[in-house]
Amino acid sequence: MFKPGKTYDAIVVGTGAAGGWAAKELSEKGMEILVLEAGKQLNPAKDFTNHAQPYNMKYRGFDRPGERELTYPNQWTASEYSKQLYIKDAEHPYITPKGKPFRWVRSRFVGGKLLHWGRNARRMNDFHFRAADHDGYGENWPIRYAEMAPYYDKVESFVGVASEKVNLPHWPDGKYLPPMALNCGEKIIQKIAPKVGMRVATKRAAMRTKSIHGLGKCHYCGACGNGCDAGAFWN
């Protein structure tokens, strides 16, 4: 909590993926941090609907006719289940250059879009860092994968990323929790893929398949975009 007259070592603006991690690292080094967030703290028990069924929703999950167009037209991943995790476009308008529309998905809450993100946690590789060498466009990054690897290790160990090692240069392996179990359709694809020269691997998902650091694990309810009251993915 902000204390008038107190001197802070650093101010972090925003509590999403970047701001939240910056505050964690700086405070763990003994620094006094002030974190500024434009939104409120949500209550998972009240604001998350990952276990809600259509009959729990007033409009069976489809929302009141015309509500999306009037209130949150740019929040394309929002629904009657999850609109409380997003801003209302009508209250926070913005403009874009003519002929260059942009749909800006925003969440003004503690945690930001980490409350409902896609949890895709792939590592970049040297094809990314040296892209200009391959396609001649732009500039290469001033860093290489080998320099980033230890930091990927640190983040994955803390966050909890479920996947499997595949030993592919364009898809670097990391420190993983057990992979998410495949469903029936995925198992069929995994079986036939080698026959056409392909292979199937599980997504690198920041989803805990077992409990670490005293946090929850996934129980496969499937409605991750509506917030996770089990605390099974990083936010």
Regions found by a protein language model. Give the residues of each.
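Flexible, glycine-rich phosphate/dinucleotide-binding loops
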Residues: G19, L42, T209
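A short, basic/flexible loop-to-alpha-helix module at the beginning of a structural domain
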Residues: M1-T7
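Glycine-rich, histidine-containing beta strand-loop boundary motifs that form or position
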Residues: T15, E37-K40, P44, R119, ...
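Glycine-rich FAD pyrophosphate-binding loop
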Residues: S27-T49
